[in-house]
């Protein structure tokens, strides 16, 4: 079976089509939004680590840096980070389905043990920005 994913992006709409053996199987269309919504996933860059809060501020393209706490990294952060690191420009990416899971991160660990300023991480918006605060991430 030959699968093909076709993505068309315009200024007003994103269309994604999945074809199997040149037959359309699934079509998703989404209106472009300029805002950041809960559930959106981004590659962000760590801007500042706050050891006292055990948290970090991450640039995801929002006017204010987003906030992520150590407890929101997720137990499989190390495995996910290895996938993200292997898919950076200039690196040869391995197959995700053959990668082995890394050990879970400690429940009461330090964020600085896993993140560094300038590091690229995959994040999801858990709470939208309000007032003077940027989005909350997980």
Description of each model-found segment:
Residues 1-138:
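Single-stranded RNA-binding surfaces
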């Amino acid at each position: 079976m030959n699968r093909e994913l076709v993505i068309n992006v315009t200024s007003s709409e994103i269309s994604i089509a999945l074809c199997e053996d040149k037959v359309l199987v699934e079509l998703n269309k989404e209106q472009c939004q300029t805002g950041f919504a809960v559930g959106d996933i981004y590659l962000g860059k760590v801007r500042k680590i706050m050891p006292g809060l055990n948290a970090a501020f991450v640039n995801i393209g929002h006017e204010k840096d987003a906030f992520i706490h150590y407890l929101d990294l997720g137990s499989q952060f190390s495995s996910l980070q290895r996938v993200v690191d292997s898919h950076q420009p200039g690196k040869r990416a391995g197959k995700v389905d053959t990668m082995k899971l890394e050990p879970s991160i400690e429940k009461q660990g330090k964020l600085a043990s896993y993140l560094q300023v300038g590091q690229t991480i995959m994040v999801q918006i858990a709470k939208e920005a309000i007032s003077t605060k940027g989005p909350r991430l997980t």
